Amino acid sequence: MAVPVPLGTEDRTSRLTLRRPDRWRREDAPQADLRLTGDDAVLTVRSRPSERTIAEEHTSLLERLPGSVDGLRLIGCDPWTTAGAPARLVEYVRPDEEGDVAGAHLLFVTGRHRVDLTIERPLARMLATDDLVSAVLESVRATEPAPSRPQRELETLPVAVPVPQLDGTHLGADALLTLRSLAGRRWDPMLLRSPAGRELVQTGLVGRLGTLPEPTQELIAPWADDTQPVTLEQRLPDGRTTRLQAWSETVVDGTDETGGTVARLPVERVVALAAGRLGIRPSWTFPFRTGALDADLLARRTGDAGTAPDLPAAVAEADPRLARFWAAPWTVSSIRRPGRPTPVVVVHAEGIGFARTGRTEAGETAFRSDSPANVYRSLVRALLG
């Protein structure tokens, strides 16, 4: 449950009012209606004349944002109902020289104006500031009359961006195992005679005389203490399985049986890579009427794609939203964290959205829809938490 956040000061512009913590400070910003800073967050309000609907303005925003900053990723969008005007909340993450930045963009229209309120803070502080940011956003109220035209249907959202690929060195299973064995040890010249050792030399990870270049030493350093990785395992709709493991900044994309690609990345790039694998992008999130399903039924649906059972007819008839989700191709992802025996299990239904499995009690497993932004937060918690 979110902790109540005290908001003591009210700020007002010609288009809105909001409440914020007393410790936040107003700053001069000639190009903005309002600029506030505090708790590592920067809040900016801008407005301009517009007679377009919220659907038109939201579609325009989703089309424009990814091109505004190279590498910006949209992680979610939702209708917003507390502003007193038609509104949408868009969440995104963008690269920055000092570290990735998480943004919340509240957009609303009054029929005469479009108002944009953004709150940005470091991605590393995203989870710590979520309650505060949410409280400020929920305090926002439009001061102009809302348009009389109701928005009856939600607008179409953009298609998914291409899944990013890991740019690194591909190694066979034996070579990868040999590389891991070098962490914290001296190079054994005898390994030069093995196929795995020769592969490491050919890829440049090991020198021809058995030396370990500095980049290789940095790459294998997390393995010296037998540190356990954060692991993202996925079962794809065609039945294939993939695995992405991250030891801080050392990443392996592959399995023990087939080998994989190894690379060293800033941990924020690892988050971006995993978000792409999960298929995180803006999608509308609607709750299922059904809160739990037969545990065996759900276990078979999240298991081998070739044995996926049908949803019982009575459940499908009572919950059409769940029936559509169940019928779509699934990617089942497990996020495993060191020291946590139970993984976070997330289901992505192609073209629809996300759901999450929960506890099993009395033969039934909790199963609820989830927003892409919340799934993204699970990644942040696992990799940066």
Task: Show where each model-derived region lies.
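Surface-exposed amphipathic alpha-helical segments
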Residues: 22-24, 117-152, 370-385
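Short, amphipathic alpha-helical interface elements at domain boundaries
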Residues: 146-201, 205-211, 215-217
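Signature of long, low-cysteine stretches enriched in small and polar/charged residues
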Residues: 60-110, 134
